[in-house]
From Swiss-Prot:
Pfam family, any one: Ribosomal_L6
Organism: Kineococcus radiotolerans (strain ATCC BAA-149 / DSM 14245 / SRS30216)
Taxonomic superkingdom: Bacteria
Family per similarity comment: Belongs to the universal ribosomal protein uL6 family.
Molecular-function GO term, any one: structural constituent of ribosome
HAMAP family the record matches: Ribosomal_uL6_B
GO biological process, one term: cytoplasmic translation
Keyword vocabulary terms for this entry: Ribonucleoprotein, Ribosomal protein, RNA-binding, rRNA-binding
GO CC annotations, alphabetized: cytosolic large ribosomal subunit
Name assigned to this protein: Large ribosomal subunit protein uL6
Record SUPFAM superfamilies: Ribosomal protein L6 (SSF56053)
Amino acid sequence: MSRIGRLPITVPAGVDVTIDGAAVTVKGPKGELSHTVAAPISVERTEDGTLQVTRPDDERVSRSLHGLTRTLISNMVEGVTKGYEKKLEIVGTGYRVTPKGSDLEFALGFSHPVVVKAPAGITFAVENNTRFSVAGIDKQQVGEIAANIRKLRKPDPYKGKGVRYAGEQIRRKVGKAGK
């Protein structure tokens, strides 16, 4: 039995979970998320109000989807109650971020500014011109947008310049030895 998959999912007060066949919909104070559960996995509500994810057999596919499904539903419950946020920072001379409405405009050493549009469900918050955050209720979407922004100018291993996650340690390389 999957150690993660067999754990019950506690549903806090103010969160409504609807199970309609293979579709699981979670509504909370911050919004609504839905997920379609893969074929061999089933989700049931227990008497004490928690959710239990079960699998019919010990096939390899069932075992792999068991823990995954439980974690995805747990992330949905946490997302609609607390939400998710990724903090990023920019290091480098002349590198900065400015808010343009709901979008972000980056100056990252290119000959042109780079504009990142906020998709539905994602909000950007700019602390100062080198620190900002990506927030939303969908953990996967928040992480993907943050990774795409980081990919605009990955941290340089020699000088450390670029966009990085807050608190990320960049592995530095030694430059070539001069004579």
